[in-house]
Amino acid sequence: MNRFIISMIALLAVFCAVSTASPLLYRAPQYQMYDDVQFVKRSNAELINGLIGMDLGKLSAVGKRSNAELINGLLSMNLNKLSGAGRR
């Protein structure tokens, strides 16, 4: 009787150890955030056409952002990197 209880406790301990260790053994590889991401490249002409097509009147009327906030956001964009990446 004592052997049976000891063997069941040992079996339970082995099962717990294996079930706890399996996520550590078979974990998906961790990647850097932007290592394998391909960025979509756009030329400056496409960027300017997109900005011209924005209806700032509707944006101001809705009240989600003021025009000053929108312009500040556009000024903070790094256009040098975009210009270098967009050449075809």
Curated annotation (Swiss-Prot):
Signal peptide coordinates: 1-21
An example of a Gene Ontology BP annotation on this entry?
A: locomotion involved in locomotory behavior
UniProt subcellular location: Secreted
Arranged from A to Z, the UniProt key words for this protein are:
Secreted, Signal
**What GO CC terms are in its UniProt record?**
extracellular region
Q: Does the keyword Nuclease apply?
A: no
Main localization of the protein?
secreted
Phenotype of the disrupted gene, per the record: Conditional knockdown in AVB, PVP, and SIAV neurons reduces exploratory roaming behavior.
Function text? Probable ligand of isoforms a and b of the calcitonin receptor-like protein, pdfr-1, a G-protein coupled receptor. May not signal through isoform c of pdfr-1. Involved in locomotion; more specifically mate searching behavior of males, independent of nutritional status. Involved in regulating the male-specific expression of TGFbeta-like daf-7 in the ASJ chemosensory neurons. Plays a role in circadian rhythms of locomotor activity.
Name the chain's protein: Pigment dispersing factor homolog pdf-1
Q: What is the lineage of its organism?
A: Eukaryota, Metazoa, Ecdysozoa, Nematoda, Chromadorea
